[in-house]
Amino acid sequence: MQKDPQVASEVKEILNIIKEIAPGGLVELRIPPYAAIQCVAGGNHKRGTPPNTVEMSGQVLIQLIKEPRSWHKLCAQGDIAASGINSDLSQIFVIAATKYPAQ
């Protein structure tokens, strides 16, 4: 999978905002092929597949930061794969959207 430099830059910026507002290791947020971070306080994951994972494309991440209330719709459409009891990041994206400068 080829990386788009513009998408890579925006993904990095968005993930830095997420880490700032929701530090921790309870959820692994994966944006292949760009990056993966651990976020949300309340636990730490060290090895293997974490119990709470969220995965989406870079384009979906960018769409979500611009339309943060679309979390549940994007999950239902299969654009976001979220598994685990603590994998609902919808409110984190609502907060993150207020800090994203490209609005």
Where are these regions (language model features)?
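Feature captures hydrophobic
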Residues: M1-Q103
